[in-house]
């Protein structure tokens, strides 16, 4: 279970989180949403302890393996398949030890653990993941340096998926995938047996793959159960209800204030007016949940340019 308790964090004096709290149950797949700059990627860095929190705490089980994609796979001479296989460090180390161990008891322990982690099907699993992300059998045998940075990002994604971390952090994973790869990833995430947090603007992925939404807004965290469309509906209803309550309270405050203004200096009503004034002072203002205003842009139609628009000379 991932627990975020009273998290506070600021960058250059700008607060991103202020006493924010949330709980993500183990095994849940959660979409992270919020406006650009709200702190989504920062939250991942705080979870991975790359940055220190200013206040509060983020609790992750001590034995949890956390994985994510930070950069593309190196442009090495190692094949794509071997690069992915090497991402499961425990499997890699156990297989290497099995080749050199001579103690019968230790060999038994190694092979038992290899069975537990499904190590012997590793090559088939790695090949299947690479195929899902667009690499055929021939491509899987080629060295990484033969592929562009975008394709090596897919290799890095394949590697972390193969490693099966207990907490998988994905930041806009469909940005470097084609449609087929994105559809495959949606299915993979939905079936993944561990916890997944995925930052994405891909509404389709958030409707097909996740079981909850963590919304970052106003320096806080709010967890919603369900897929993205359910979150959007619930969020809209909450906005409408809060605005309705605010309007009712505003009307009540105006009514009370009008009574006070009218009768506070009238002897027969002064006590009532004073009582109403105290009632007004004790009333906690209801603030509507604000949605930041989206700036609008107007691009005027440009004037035609006289020819020639562009001249290339001895290029």
Task: Name each region found by the language model.
Residues 234-259, 263-290:
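Intracellular alpha-helical coupling/juxtamembrane segments of multi-pass membrane proteins
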């Amino acid at each position: 279970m991932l627990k975020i308790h009273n998290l506070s964090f600021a960058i250059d004096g700008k607060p991103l989180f202020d006493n924010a709290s949330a709980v993500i149950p183990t095994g849940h797949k959660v979409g992270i949403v919020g406006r650009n700059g709200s702190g989504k990627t920062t939250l991942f860095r705080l979870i991975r302890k790359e940055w220190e929190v200013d206040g509060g705490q983020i609790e992750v089980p001590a034995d949890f393996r956390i994985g994510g994609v930070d950069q593309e796979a190196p442009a090495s001479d190692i094949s794509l398949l071997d690069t992915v296989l090497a991402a499961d460090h425990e499997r890699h180390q156990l297989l290497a030890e099995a080749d050199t161990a001579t103690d019968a008891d230790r060999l038994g322990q190694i092979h038992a653990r290899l069975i537990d982690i499904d190590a012997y099907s590793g090559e088939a699993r790695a090949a299947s993941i690479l195929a899902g992300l667009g690499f055929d059998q021939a491509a899987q045998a080629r060295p990484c340096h033969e592929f562009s940075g975008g394709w090596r990002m897919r290799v890095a994604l394949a590697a972390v998926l193969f490693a099966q971390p207990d907490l998988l952090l994905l930041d806009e994973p469909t940005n470097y995938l084609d449609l087929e790869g994105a559809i495959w990833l949606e299915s993979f995430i939905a079936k993944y047996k561990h916890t997944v947090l995925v930052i994405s603007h891909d509404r389709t992925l958030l409707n097909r793959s996740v079981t909850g939404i963590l919304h970052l807004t106003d320096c806080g965290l709010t967890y919603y159960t369900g897929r993205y469309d359910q979150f959007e509906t619930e969020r809209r209803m909450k906005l409408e209800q809060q605005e309705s309550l605010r309007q009712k309270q505003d009307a009540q405050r105006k009514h009370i204030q009008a009574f006070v203004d009218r009768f506070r200096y009238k002897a027969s009503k002064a006590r009532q007016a004073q009582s109403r004034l105290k009632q007004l002072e004790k009333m906690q203002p209801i603030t509507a949940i604000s949605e930041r205003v989206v700036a609008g842009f107007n691009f005027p139609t440009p004037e035609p340019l006289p020819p020639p628009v562009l001249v290339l000379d001895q290029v």
